[in-house]
Structure formats: structure tokens, C-alpha cells
Amino acid sequence: MAKKAPDVGDYKYGFHDDDVSIFRSERGLTENIVREISNMKNEPEWMLDFRLKSLKLFYKMPMPQWGGNLSELNFDDITYYVKPSEQAERSWDEVPEEIKRTFDKLGIPEAEQKYLAGVSAQYESEVVYHNMEKELEEKGIIFKDTDSALQENEELFKKYFASVVPAADNKFAALNSAVWSGGSFIYVPKNIKLDTPLQAYFRINSENMGQFERTLIIADEGASVHYVEGCTAPVYTTSSLHSAVVEIIVHKDAHVRYTTIQNWANNVYNLVTKRTFVYENGNMEWVDGNLGSKLTMKYPNCVLLGEGAKGSTLSIAFAGKGQVQDAGAKMIHKAPNTSSTIVSKSISKNGGKVIYRGIVHFGRKAKGARSNIECDTLILDNESTSDTIPYNEVFNDQISLEHEAKVSKVSEEQLFYLMSRGISEEEATEMIVMGFIEPFTKELPMEYAVEMNRLIKFEMEDSIG
């Protein structure tokens, strides 16, 4: 008998487990909490200093005055560190039973066996499971949780950590820098190309929880890697905060693809800083799927520093009742003959709000640079809204910039055509939406495309009538 595929759609039901943590910090953000986190991790002195300086920056920096409403986000109500187990296990059988049951529901063991070169699973503040194929280690590839990389690869770690996203970048980058825990660290040596993805899962289980993973990826000259992350959390009446930082360095002739499929519950603030430095003839691809959350503010950024560097963002955002998806991309052209592409697909229903917010910058040295932007929004009812807010900065006259934006509704003609062939209105609307997101799903590995379609179908429930 065929085994049932892991159903990421189960996230929709917001299951959560009993608290199995072995340590939980007090609520609120203080210097003592920051010191406690660093002490529990047995970190070097320079990292504690970095955290404390970041905390001071966080206190000084203002809240963003644009994007979604953050007035209900209470930093004193959040638990900043929860340790779910003693250590990250390399055998699935050794993961604590309660935690293992959660990830079993999400299909992680089966996904690892079938599709992946390496897997990391983070539960609350810490990675609880981590494994990588032995042959990849033999090639010199490093794939660890970020805390382990700090301890075991300190020189390499220190060279790149906070070099792309400094603590002073924005208030939530400063917050992450003060209390970061977990995340993935990847180093791919020169000319090594991974054919199968590395993957991480991030799960918030507790109420009023803050998750602050820090991911750092370095693709050395001529290297290639695809990293996939999935994110989920159960439904609570009070708010949780996910505030990650992702830093990526794409060296000469290297290629990185970073795929995100998030399905946070609608009580989660998802406030993330993602940025990459791309050097000569390097290629960075962001593939970004944003479902769920109360508010998402996320703008994957490519800084194109070397001649011929390429950057692209392909994103989809789905906003339902009570949700705001404020997402987009930033492309910063700093070198000649660089190129960038932004394709943004947004869907809103039941009063949801989607906002595309993007920046394309052409510096004085970016002669011959070019950028293409496409923003398409599908609005499913009269209560939902969409805004497109592009911002372009041009400091030389030898560039090419194209921008196309389109807002549409499901047309009566489309529905009539499909319904005249015996298809119900609900099924017809679903088919139109699936066609709309197809440019996104076709870029996903097959198993993720299937799950993305399932998630969209769950989101589409009750969209008719």
C-alpha cells in the first residue's frame, strides 16, 4: 500500500503540543536575559559583547513607521528563549518523543529519506535534530546549526557573521542580534555543487514565544547550493514573534537558491531581514512563499557587488481575514552589467491586505545594469485591498529599468466559461487561483509544489459566497 505523503496542509489546523522544554527564560527583554542566553550556550566573550551592544541599539532605535501596524506588539510579553532539549540529535530516534511527534505530523522523517541532502529541525529556540549525508561532509561542506558552527568553526563564523546584516541595520535586526538562537550555518567549498537541497524546519510551539534564528550561508567561488526552509506555528489568542536574520555570501561564479515556504498562524508577527552579497558573475535566487501570520514584513535583498552579478526574487503572498502581507524585494546594483528580476504574485481575500514594497537602486558604477519588475495581484472580493509601492533610485544614465504592475479580480467571463463545463463556482475560482500562482509553484521541488498547492486550497476555503 502506498504511504500517505506528508501533509503540510495539517499546519492549517494549528495543532500544538504540551510544553516539554527543559528551560524557559522569564518574559521580557533585559540585559540579564541576554547574558543568560549567552551563558547557557557557553559562548565566547566577543559574542556576548556583540549581543549586549545589539541590545543597546535595539533600545535606541525607533519602531518602523511604515508597513503594518505594530502597536499591539508588546516586547515585555514575549519569552525570548526556550530550550526544548539538551542537544541537537543526529538520530531521529533520539529526539524527545513529544517533539518528534510534532515533526512526524509535518512529514520530516519521510521528506528527509526521499528528497534531501541534509535536514535541520528547530523547535522553539534550539535545533533539536540535525543530519547531513556523510559524503557531503567528505567534500568539505559544512551544514550545522548556527550555535554549533560558532563553537566548532569559530574563525570562519566570525569572518562572515553580521557582515551582511549588521545589528544597526534596523530595530528587528538589532533584536535578533541580541537574542539570536539556532538557525543554519552552511559553507560550500570552491567548485562544489550540491544536486539535492539542504532543508531546515522552524516550529514555534509555545504561546507568546519569540523565535530568533540566525542563518548564515557562504557559497565559495564556483559553488552551488539550494536551501529550503519551512516555518509553522499553532494558533493562539495572544501574539508570537518571529524575527530572523538571514545572511548569504555568493562568491565569484557561485549560485545560491533560497526557498521559503511559511505558513505561520494568524497570531504571529513575522518580521525578517534577509540579505545577500553577490560578487562577480554570482547568482542569487530568492523563492519566497508567504502564507499566514498576522503581519509579515519581509523584503529579500540582493546587493550586486561584482560585475555580471545576478539577483532575482520570485514571491507569492496570500492575505486572508485579519492578515497583512507587506512584502517585496530590494535590488541594489553596485557594479557594471549586473541584472535583477523581481516577480511578485499577491492574493487577497476576506478583507486581507497585500502590499508590494520594493527598492531598485542603480549606483554610479552600475553602468549597463538592468532590472525587470512584475507585480500581479488577484483580489477575490470587494473587502480586500492591494497596494504597490515601488521606489527606484537611479544614479547613472546607462541602465535599463522595466516595471509592470497589474491588479485584477476573478472575471465573470472566466467563471462563466468554466461553470458552463460543469465546474462549480468554488472549483472554478480555485482553478483560476492555481493558474495565477503557477509561475511560483513550478520553481519549487515537486514535493513542495504539491504542498504549496494544498496550502493555497486550505486558504481558499470559504472564499465563495
UniProtKB/Swiss-Prot annotation:
Entry-linked InterPro entries: Fe-S_cluster_assembly_SufBD, SUF_FeS_clus_asmbl_SufB, SUF_FeS_clus_asmbl_SufBD_core, SUF_FeS_clus_asmbl_SufBD_sf, SufBD_N
Pfam family, one: SUFBD_core
Entry's Gene Ontology BP terms: iron-sulfur cluster assembly
Transmembrane segments: none
Superkingdom, natural source: Bacteria
Similarity comment: family membership: Belongs to the iron-sulfur cluster assembly SufBD family.
PANTHER family: FES CLUSTER ASSEMBLY PROTEIN SUF, UPF0051 PROTEIN ABCI8, CHLOROPLASTIC-RELATED
Protein name as it appears in the record: Iron-sulfur cluster assembly SufBD family protein SAB0778
Species of provenance: Staphylococcus aureus (strain bovine RF122 / ET3-1)
